[in-house]
Amino acid sequence: MTDAPEPRTIRFALTELAEQVDAFWQRFPGARAGDDGAAFEAEGATLWLPLAAPRARASEPVGDYAERLEARDEVQVVLLLQAGAMAFGCWRGAELMQHKAVRKYVVRGNGKSQATHLKTRGKSRYGSRLRLQNWKSLLRETNERLADCEAQFGPFDQIFHAVPVRVWPELFAVEPAPVFGRDDERLRRLPLHVHRPDHAELLRVRRQLLAGRIGWSR
């Protein structure tokens, strides 16, 4: 009885996507994308696309995907937003075109944001107005900076975000409204654990988005 071969994995960067997809196509011409478009699967091998890569269509043949890959650089945004902290970056291809990280005083002594406290416990006293004003100011600034970024560099191709579910409606409740709709097909929730937003965390998340990999067992 022979042992099963050890699975092997190689990693590649987004800049190598076209080369890696083409090579995978040549070796596994029958490979197709899964239902979520995140990877191409063949017997004994899988190519996981970088999260920042153009998404494959459900069941799309790898050859079709390879032929429609464009040489142009996409304009992509990463938005990280939590109570009292926001960081965003706008990239064209590998170039960081614009970025900003902001922190404001919106968290109560018990660690709960003022907006959440008002929803669950009612009005608080000292400092509540300041915290709530700061929170709304942060939401407005977030939308303003995204609008300015789109005005300068053109429509976003993909919008990656880590925004708590309870915060999402609040982002749409302030003026100006976001430059995207609630059900915008460009929106992609980050499938990553995100720490408190700042510039270093923004860059860490971006690096995660650029990594793809190929695994095979034969």
Regions found by a protein language model. Name each.
Residues 1-218:
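Terminal alpha-helical anchor/extension segments at protein ends
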